[in-house]
Structure formats: structure tokens, C-alpha cells
């Protein structure tokens, strides 16, 4: 497999590196360690500042030395874990430089920390991590911990949800880790205010019918996914929740002390949605564990 790891020397990036080290990658796996150097935001802050401020060269040289050291610090534990490592120092804003590098290198997985810091431009701020997730064409792991001992899989039966399921099922680094398959029924209840009693009664009847149908549908989807994992020899169980999808997914991982949420980047829309882009984004913002966002590829994506 090919893993792209973005670092910046922050504790979050260190956890991301340690998470990569902790997983059992297949033989021949390669990790590309990158950092992004963008001095422009720190050096040019307004029209009154000269085009090339005094000390700009020294400032850039210092930043270059620091990020080079950060990259080399990440190399040693990865190589000690038996991984082949290559490195590069990217130029440009991290939110663009990292996805652009991923498009050229074509990793099976991009790994970033959830927050970052740096002397020049923060390489892995929450907003930057979000941008990497938005622009990457392959799965992105946003690391908040340094290990994975349990997985929560968001399931709604959508193509993106099935891509997430297939990844968990097929990727050897995730083999042997217990899985909780969670679906969320999200049907908006009617408001009584401003509705005539007879209309409200009809709306409630429709709501009851829809939520009953959704419970049955999601229950079947969850059961089928659990059966698929169990048939492959995996430990898996299902859980059906009701409410706001993002909120319930975050609560589910908290209630079960999960280490990783795996979620499709897009899912069903409408009243029965669960894994929409907005849901994945909200989970990224609020989950306290690592989040693996799986894209729906234009073509099948197979780890090398």
C-alpha cells in the first residue's frame, strides 16, 4: 500500500505518525512523509510591507530547516516499523499542496493530524485537514489518537457507505479489529404550530409510517452488513439509532469508547439520509476519535 503522511511537528501530527506506525501494513508498503512550506502569509501582511521584506531569506531558511527536521524525525519510527519511507518538502499553502501532491503520487490513503502548528503557516489546522479531506481523491484518515482497537462504521446502504464497508472489509491494516455497524434513522417530526388538528393528525400518521419503514429498512441494511463481516471471520455487531445522523454517530463512538469512525463522504439524501457530505464534515469537526473518510471513486480504487 501507499500511504501519504503529512507532518508539521505538532502533537497532532505526531499522533498521526504513531497511528501509522501502529497498524500492520502489508509487506512492501511505502510511506511518503511530506510537510508544506508556505512563507507568504507570514511575510506579506499588507500593502505597506515591501514586496521582499528584510530578513525574508533568513526567515524562509529557518522554516526550511525546521520542517526538514520534522520530516526526518518522522522517518525513524516508520522505518523501525519495517516501512519503506520517502520524503519531500512541498511548497505552497498546505490546504492545496498536500492534495496536489496526493493527486500526483496517488496514495491509497492520506493521513493527517486534526490540528497543527508551525513557525510559518500551520500545516494541519482543522481547516486545512478539512480541505485535504474535501480535495483528496482517495480515503483520508484524520488522526486524533495513536491506535485503533475498535471501529464504528457508518452505514446507510448508499454507494459511499458501501465503499466504506468494502474498505474496512478488505484492508489488511484493519483486519482483526472489532466493528460496530451503526445506522441512524432521521425522519423529521411534524410541527404542530400553525397546522389544523386534522392536518397535524394526518402528518403524524405519515411520520409514523415513514419512521416505521425507515427502521425496518435500516435494520435490514445493518443486519446484512454485520452478516457480511461475520462471514469473513470478523467480529461485528449492529446498532440502530434515531435522531440527527452526525450527532448520533459521535454519541455512538463516545458511548462505546471507539477509536475510529469510518464514514462515506456522500450518502443518501432526503428524509432518510445518514452519510451526506455535511454529515461527514460534522463528524470530522465533533468526533474525539480518529475519522476515516472514504470517497466514492469514479473508478474502483484498489490498494497496491
Give the location of each predicted region:
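Small/aliphatic-rich secondary-structure junction motif
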Residues: 1-54, 81-86, 148-208, 228-239, ...
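Structural beta-alpha unit
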Residues: 12, 22, 38-41, 54-61, ...
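A generic structural signal for short
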Residues: 62-63, 86-87, 117-118, 156-157, ...
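Short alpha-helical
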Residues: 11, 93-96, 119, 127, ...
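Hydrophobic alpha-helical membrane-association signature
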Residues: 16, 70, 160, 164, ...
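A short acidic, glycine-rich active-site loop
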Residues: 53-69, 202-220
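Gly/Ser-rich helix-loop-strand patches that form or flank binding pockets
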Residues: 2, 17, 22, 26, ...
